[in-house]
């Protein structure tokens, strides 16, 4: 009896065994679909900012020095003026909460010097001297500044920084001189010279957060271009080229974060 049962079980297994793959084929393997990541909008301009500044210059950038006339007469004049402001625009980038940098293009209005002299009304015949001159100096600058923001306290962020770049100085001169006693001294000058030189800045200031994107910036900047050239007026016959310009700037600016 037991032998028959074992024989029947073996026979049933032999019959069902070929059917197993067929049955398995009726069931497809499960398909696993990865869940799509949540949509994250791309922030265009994140970290970038725009800026604009105006500055008051308490000292002269182009130092003309003293002017000397041949003698003191009524018909002589000398004037020297220099615009005491500086303006710049630029853009920058926040690398993190403490480091940032910006590139600024600036304009220095510069100075204007004029002189004139005519002693023909008082000098002996044949000895009169007539002379006049006009000098104009101004500059454009392109400076890359780097800053360290020293933390924010009640909305105020102090910072220090330094920069390096180029300055383009323009010097214009027109002058004439007539010596009735010796015509070999006569001359007429006219020049318009542009020159590029290295410049650097030292910066410090405070920024105040007005809104999420707008900051008011009150700062100090020392600007120097040791090799920049400009023209000066020393006398009716001397208009030398001098080297080196610098200034101290009290700056007021706005920064707009492009978040």
Question: What role is predicted for each listed range?
Answer:
Residues 1-9:
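Bacterial N-terminal signal peptides that target proteins for export
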Residues 10-18:
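Bacterial N-terminal signal peptides
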Residues 23-52, 63, 259:
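Outer-membrane beta-barrel biogenesis signature
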Residues 44-90, 94, 100:
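Short, contiguous, helix-prone interaction/anchoring segments in small proteins
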Residues 47-49, 84-86, 139-143, 157, ...:
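Transmembrane beta-barrel architecture of outer-membrane proteins
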Residues 52-54, 89-93, 142-148, 162-166, ...:
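Residues on the lipid-exposed face of transmembrane beta-strands in outer-membrane beta-barrel proteins
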Residues 58-82, 107-141, 167-197, 225-249:
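Extracellular/periplasm-exposed beta-strand and loop segments of Gram-negative cell-envelope proteins
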Residues 98-101, 154-156, 208-216:
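Repeated loop/turn-to-beta-strand initiation elements of outer-membrane beta-barrel proteins
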């Amino acid at each position: 009896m037991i032998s028959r049962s074992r024989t029947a079980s073996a026979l049933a297994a032999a019959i069902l065994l070929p059917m197993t793959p067929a049955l398995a084929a009726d069931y497809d393997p499960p398909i696993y679909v990865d869940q799509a990541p949540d949509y994250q909008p791309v922030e265009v301009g994140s970290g970038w900012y725009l800026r604009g500044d105006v500055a008051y210059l308490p000292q002269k950038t182009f130092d003309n020095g003293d002017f000397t006339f041949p003698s003191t007469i009524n018909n002589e004049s000398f004037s020297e003026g220099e615009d005491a402001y500086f303006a710049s625009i630029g853009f920058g980038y926040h690398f993190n909460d403490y480091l940032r940098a910006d590139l600024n293009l600036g304009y220095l209005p510069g100075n204007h010097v004029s002189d004139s002299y005519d002693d023909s009304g008082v000098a002996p015949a044949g000895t009169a001297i007539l002379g006049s001159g006009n000098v104009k100096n101004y500059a454009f600058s392109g400076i890359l500044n780097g800053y360290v923001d020293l933390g924010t306290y009640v909305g105020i962020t102090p910072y220090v920084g330094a920069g390096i770049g180029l300055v383009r100085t323009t010097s214009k001169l027109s002058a004439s001189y007539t010596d009735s006693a010796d015509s070999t001294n006569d001359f007429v000058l006219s020049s318009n010279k542009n020159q590029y030189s290295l410049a650097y800045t030292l910066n410090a200031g405070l920024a105040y957060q007005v809104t999420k994107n707008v900051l008011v910036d009150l700062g100090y900047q020392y600007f120097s271009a040791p090799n920049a050239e400009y023209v000066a007026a020393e006398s009716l016959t001397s208009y030398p080229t001098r080297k080196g310009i610098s200034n101290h700037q009290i700056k007021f600016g706005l920064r707009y974060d492009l978040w």
